[in-house]
Amino acid sequence: MVKYLNQKEAINVDLELFNEYKFSVDQLMELAGLSCAHAITKCFPADRFGRVLVCCGPGNNGGDGLVCARHLALMGYTPAIYYPKPTAKPLFENLSHQCQRMEICRIDECPTVETSANSYDLIVDALFGFSFKPPVRVDFVPVVELLQQTKLPIASVDIPSGWDVENGKLNDCDLEPTLLISLTAPKLCAKHFKGKHHFLGGRFVPPALQRKYELNLPEYPGNELCLELETHK
């Protein structure tokens, strides 16, 4: 059975990938974001869900979102990026620049529920990852409220934004994505996920690291970058 990680385990696995296995942040971010794009194509085909709002947070989860948006643009989608608090680090500045040069639209104001319903077919939630601690910062309150109130399908990257990493929803009004894409290994909060699709992405975990943490990750089929897991309905 696949292991679901608590917050400390998730942080330690990441640290070992960086420190022991010498992966770089941008290397893992590229692989993670690409696997998210592939999972989205399997659940939301471009001919029906082509207009995508990608909501990016200030940390690595937001970086995954920027990478995902770039790959979606290459896969026949028309993404738009909402990035309310850009991170002033070269990696994130470069990712933003790449999206700009790919002619991906970036919007400056969070759309209303009504505007988003008319303008988009799908929302990608790449706001907060497994390091999130409540409360939500003021810059992100409007977009979190949009995610809570929208009727559009949502694809959440690793952690549904606003959820506790281990315990899931903190409030009844918290968002419930249609698709959850767990990265590296699922986190404990994924056991509380009731949506339609749960995918695993991030096909880069070394065998020795899998054994050390007893991750019991399923084998990815063929050359796939993601695979579907059972949901706990």
From Swiss-Prot:
One of its GO terms (molecular function) is nucleotide binding. Catalyzes the epimerization of the S- and R-forms of NAD(P)HX, a damaged form of NAD(P)H that is a result of enzymatic or heat-dependent hydration. This is a prerequisite for the S-specific NAD(P)H-hydrate dehydratase to allow the repair of both epimers of NAD(P)HX. Its EC number is 5.1.99.6. Pfam families: YjeF_N. Keywords: Isomerase, Metal-binding, NAD, NADP, Nucleotide-binding, Potassium. InterPro entries: YjeF_N_dom, YjeF_N_dom_sf, YJEFN_prot_NAXE-like. Binds 1 potassium ion per subunit. This is NAD(P)H-hydrate epimerase. (6S)-NADPHX binds at residues 60-64, 129-135, 158. GO terms for cellular component: mitochondrion. It comes from Drosophila grimshawi. Belongs to the NnrE/AIBP family. Its cofactor is K(+). The keyword Metal-binding applies. Residues 10-217 form the YjeF N-terminal domain. K(+) binds at residues 61, 125, 161. It catalyses: (6R)-NADHX = (6S)-NADHX; (6R)-NADPHX = (6S)-NADPHX.
